[in-house]
Regions:
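Conserved C-terminal structural/oligomerization subdomain of aldehyde/semialdehyde dehydrogenase
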Residues: 243, 250-403
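Rossmann-like NAD(P) dinucleotide-binding subdomain of oxidoreductase/dehydrogenase enzymes
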Residues: 14-156, 280, 397
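Short glycine-enriched loop/turn motifs at secondary-structure junctions
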Residues: 106-107, 140-142, 172-174, 207, ...
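Long amphipathic alpha-helix in the N-terminal Rossmann-like dinucleotide-binding domain
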Residues: 1-10, 22-23
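Residue-level signal for inorganic ion chemistry
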Residues: 60, 92, 113, 142, ...
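Structural detector of well-ordered beta-strand residues that form the stable sheet scaffold
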Residues: 57, 64, 93, 135-137, ...
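ALDH superfamily catalytic-core signature
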Residues: 120-260, 323, 394-402
């Protein structure tokens, strides 16, 4: 944004279309909204705050930030970084507290809210913003689907499933939570995933591949979803039970097959280190099931035919799609990021994202040398207007030219 922000927010001059093109000039000014309220979650507490913070500040706003009450020092760190970088002290302020503090921020007279968190809380935030008639960006939950095509590079796709599901212990809104694989490659794909998962390590200290579950609330959800899946016929090939050899909340890297859409594991956000693989007839069924979700944050398609991957991705009802990669959209600053359905409202990143922290203020200048008619109406002026309408809209060539 330091490199491209000025270009994104530069004043733009436009010529109107239609009959106005010879009489008016439009100038678009991107004005700061004022004060942005920023509410951020416990997973990725620095990254998920720094991104909207940078965009709001670069657009000329002040920011009041309410971090999660269970990761308060992340915001303190961000504030220190901003002050060391030369940001005026009061331009970015942090308020600590729980949900009541967040609710107070919503009604404190801010000009926009940027919220990242759960669907349930996001609904409350959206309702408050509607009541206060202020815009909001809501980045909510996800249940990202991975579609593995029959021609996919199995080694690469299996690695994508493992990385996408286990990254940050699954505590990632764009983490892969559902994997759909055609029958023709199902067994070798599952074998590859199992082979890659078994050597992964988990430890309370030192180097390890998968860390701890953040807290007891998330552990309860993970265990509930696994219990429900087992009761409905799912097969656990690796892991599947809480790692009680370690003190704390540890759930091992887990691979589950024979899953379906009757299970919470395939319907609700799990937010844990689980690869859940469902067998499908073909890519068409995979796409149908991928779209059979209340969520629509992002997704990914794996194939050696990049054009086919793009075609399938374009049919996924999600905010964004990656081909032969996982969860990359948030890291591509030029690509707008946001969800559809219950995954959110609005977008961050890119030109669209930074302009979302502005009011687009058009100034329209009349470029003619005399008044364009007015009171009192006369038969002559009315006749002139009728002739103009007939001339422009009654002639196909002129209609194409002016309309």
């Amino acid at each position: 944004y330091a490199k491209h922000g000025k270009k994104y927010l530069a004043t733009k001059t436009r010529r109107p279309s239609g009959v106005m093109r010879f009489a008016k000039k439009v100038t678009l000014h991107y004005q700061p909204l004022g004060v942005v309220g920023l509410i951020t979650p416990w997973n990725g507490p620095v990254a998920l705050a720094a991104n909207p913070l940078a965009q709001a500040l670069m657009a000329g706003n002040a920011v009041v930030h309410k971090p999660s009450e269970v990761t308060p020092f992340s915001a303190v760190l961000l504030q220190e970084i901003c002050e060391k970088a030369g940001l005026p002290k009061d331009l970015y302020q942090v308020v600590q507290g729980d949900g009541a503090t967040g609710a107070a921020l919503l009604d404190a007279g801010v000009d926009k809210i940027s919220f990242t968190g759960s669907v349930a809380t996001g609904r409350k935030v959206g309702e408050a913003c509607g009541r206060n008639l202020i815009p909001c960006t809501l980045e909510l939950g996800g249940k990202d689907a991975m579609i593995v095509c029959a021609d996919a590079d199995l080694e690469r796709a299996a690695d994508g499933a493992v990385r996408g599901s286990f990254f940050n212990t699954g505590h990632y809104c764009c983490g892969t939570e559902r994997v759909y694989v055609p029958d023709s490659i199902y067994e070798p794909f599952v074998d590859k995933v199992v082979e890659m998962t078994k050597p992964l390590t988990q430890a309370a200290s030192g180097a390890s591949d998968v860390g701890a579950v953040f807290w007891d609330k998330q552990m309860d959800i993970i265990e509930d979803h696994m219990r429900d899946a087992r009761e409905k016929g799912a097969q656990v090939l690796v892991g599947g039970e809480r790692n009680r050899s370690l003190s704390g909340y540890y759930f091992p890297p887990t691979v589950v097959t024979d899953v379906d859409h009757t299970m919470d594991l395939m319907r609700r956000e799990t937010f844990g280190p689980i690869v859940a693989i469902q067998k499908v007839r073909d890519e068409d069924e995979a796409l149908e099931l991928a779209n059979d979700s209340d969520y629509g944050l992002s997704g990914n398609v794996w194939t050696q035919d990049l054009e086919k991957g793009a075609r399938i991705g374009a049919k996924m009802v999600t905010g964004s799609v990656s081909v032969n990669d996982i969860a990359v959209t948030y890291g591509v600053a030029e690509a707008p990021f946001g969800g559809v359905k219950e995954s959110g409202v609005g977008q961050v990143n890119g030109e669209v994202g930074i302009r979302g922290y502005c009011h687009v203020h058009p100034v329209i200048v009349d470029t003619t040398k005399k008044a364009q008619g007015g009171y009192p109406y006369t038969e002559e002026s009315a006749d002139g207007l009728r002739k103009m309408v007939r001339t422009v809209f009654g002639n196909k060539f002129l209609r194409r030219l002016f309309v």
